[in-house]
Amino acid sequence: MTDQHRPLQSENRSEHIIDALQQARKTRSPVYINGGGSKQHLMGRNCDYTVLDVSEHRGIVDYQPQELVITARAGTPLVDIIAVLAAEGQSLSFEPPLFNGIATLGGTLACNLSGPARPWSGSIRDMVLGVQLINGKCERLNFGGKVIKNVAGYDVSRLQAGALGTLGVLCEVSLKVLPRAEKTLTLCYDMSAPEAVRHMNQRAGQPKPLSGAVWLNGQLHLRLSGAASAVDSTVVQWGGEILESGDILWEQLREMTLPFFNDAGALWRFSVQSSAEVRLDFGTT
């Protein structure tokens, strides 16, 4: 690994993490794992806990561009990883929120945040090759590996996705990465929500470089990402208006800063079949 692959800050603080966990075991104190602190709103109720700061446990451990695999410590900011990959013409294969640059690799895996490209590119869970963690007994454990063709045993490493740190403190994560898309653009169409659902399902079933779909303010937005020839040919076939500010739209969706995220009313999420018709009936209060 050359110097260009090393972020400015790199430090192995795993021994400090073990010491802190040993002290918490002695006092039988719950532990709150904190990296960048960008996902505190996802951690449920407050309780009397010991804060374990892992933000200084950071740095790229190994990166082999030709193997499409990167290994980094859990406290590494995602922006550092993205910059390292971009220098080699590569990118993360999922699309996590960066939360003003403070989101870390470990927190992203622990919360399983993968962004608007998830239905097409997969989640961070799908891209995890291996992890190193420290469990509640202060044991350092390794699962998976650092190669794409890893068939050794049960895939425990992927169980960390969405576990919120309950299975141990993440120390290192190995991820599969991909070449960056040669071209990306967004098409938009004026249509109602039911029309958008039908349109999205029709388009999603075609072998095209679709990487995002959202209906917003009476318009369906479809993002295309991939080889320039594939994107251009899809534009010719699908038509629609090219949205010049498409990058801003997807960034706001990824970062959850679109206006509806901050609406005073309740925000509900439903996970259903894409073709399902959702009817809401909450009765009377």
Located regions from the model:
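C-terminal substrate-recognition/cap domain of FAD-linked oxidoreductases
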Residues: 197-285
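FAD-binding subdomain of flavoenzyme oxidoreductases
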Residues: 94-95, 101-213, 219-220
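Transmembrane alpha-helical segments of multi-pass membrane transport proteins and ion-pumping complexes
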Residues: 39-40, 111
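Short glycine-biased active-site loop of nucleotidyltransferases that positions the nucleotide triphosphate
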Residues: 40-46
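N-terminal glycine-rich flavin-associated loop
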Residues: 2-33, 54-100, 113-145, 181-191
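Short helix/loop capping segments that flank catalytic or ligand/cofactor-binding pockets
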Residues: 42, 81, 142, 231-233
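Short, well-ordered secondary-structure micro-motifs within conserved domains or adaptor modules
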Residues: 47-52
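Glycine-rich beta-strand-to-loop/alpha-helix junction loops that act as flexible
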Residues: 33-39
